[in-house]
Design a protein with these regions (language model features):
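Beta-strand-dominated extracellular/periplasmic modules and repeats
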Residues: 271-274, 281-282, 293
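Surface-exposed, glycine-biased beta-strand/turn segments
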Residues: 30-143, 147-151, 177, 186, ...
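Hydrophobic core positions of the immunoglobulin-like beta-sandwich fold
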Residues: 161, 278-279
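Hydrophobic alpha-helical membrane-insertion segments, chiefly the h-region
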Residues: 17-28
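Short histidine-centered loop motifs in beta-beta connectors
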Residues: 109-111, 115, 152-178
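Short, acidic Ser/Thr/Gly-rich low-complexity loop/linker segments typical of extracellular
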Residues: 248-275
Length: 334
């Protein structure tokens, strides 16, 4: 889909969805300053999967702004657009086990194929991911780690696939995106069959985890919402609940921000410094709302397809839309 922008055309955009002549587009008004019309290319959204079919994804790599990084494909074959509930999302802290959830859980049936999310080399397969040696008590159970043949801003990218029934690859094996690497299981610390999926940067250790929802390409016609939920002073509000409602369908998503255990360790994106992400949102108009200090705050936002859309809530100032300015992560902490 193309949109022609002519000189002196005033752009009013609800959210940042692209780059125009090196200028980041945001909610702020932007003036086209070229002497000729400029065409903006947005992802096509005309393909609609039949019921029961795997929803087509945008091709990777996909980045409609200089800060987007959809570099990975789905590690499971899914039949409909689904994503985890607010429980056990990235950044959730489980008080029962005193552990931080450093990935996302994707529910599936035992024995379903698990696929490589990108090209790379298998650097671990089996029990014992944490220690790097055989350990039948490892909480990941049978796991696979891939060191990818591509990275981001000079950092090497890794993915982890946990709780497998079995691994069908071995250390040193080269894989391509979509290659089967194992099957869904219930090994390790898990209460039911699912895939635990992680994205790691730099050295591949869990100290460098990132939210996978910012790295996995969305289905056609869908986008991602990320943001910061903060108090009046600009500090993160950990484990804070809020809602997102589709104005077209009435569907409601309940979302909880990252726990303080995660934000204190700076395990969020180096640019966004987000404390929540919600993936697989159909393009369209939404109402975002939350309670703060006995007040109720809400606003309408537009989700653009194939992009990371961003919103900030700052206490009594309410919601502000558009990509954030570059900032020091320490300023968000208490």
């Amino acid at each position: 889909m193309k949109a022609a922008i002519r000189p002196s055309t005033l752009l009013r955009l609800a959210l940042c969805t692209g780059v125009l002549a090196g200028l980041l587009l945001s909610k702020s008004s932007v003036m086209a300053n070229s002497s000729t019309p400029v065409d903006l290319d947005f992802p096509e959204t005309t393909e609609t999967p039949e019921p029961g079919q795997y929803p087509a994804l945008y091709d990777v790599p996909l980045a409609l702004s200089m800060h987007d990084h959809f570099l990975l494909t789905r590690p499971l074959i899914i039949e409909e657009v689904t994503w985890p509930t607010s429980d056990f999302r990235y950044g959730f802290f489980d008080t029962k086990t005193n552990s931080l959830h450093t990935g996302i859980d994707m529910v599936s049936e035992i024995g379903e194929p698990v696929l490589a999310a990108g090209d790379g080399e298998v650097i671990f397969a089996g029990y014992g991911l944490i220690k790097g040696t055989l350990d039948m008590d490892d909480p990941y159970g049978i796991a696979v780690m891939i060191k990818h043949s591509f990275g981001f801003e000079g950092n090497t990218l890794y993915t982890v696939y946990g709780h497998l029934q079995k691994a069908i690859v071995e250390d040193g094996q080269i894989v391509k995106a979509g290659d089967p690497i194992g099957t869904v299981g219930i090994t390790g610390n898990t209460s039911g069959p699912h895939l635990h999926f992680e994205v790691r940067l730099q050295d591949g250790q869990d100290a460098a985890v990132q939210n996978p929802e910012l790295w996995l390409a969305p289905p056609l016609g869908h986008g991602v919402l990320a943001g910061r939920i903060q108090n009046d002073r600009g500090n993160f509000l950990p484990s804070k609940s809020f809602s997102l409602k589709s104005m077209e369908t009435g569907k409601i998503w309940k979302i909880t921000t990252y726990s303080q255990n995660l934000t204190n360790r700076h395990l969020n994106d180096d640019y966004f410094h987000e404390n929540f992400v919600l993936h697989d949102l159909p393009e369209g108009t939404y109402e975002i709302s939350t309670y703060y200090n006995y007040g109720f705050y809400k606003a309408e936002i537009e989700i653009a397809p194939g992009a990371i859309n961003f919103v900030t809530f700052r206490g009594k100032q309410g919601f502000v839309f558009g990509y954030p300015e570059i900032s020091d992560p320490a300023e968000f902490l208490h």
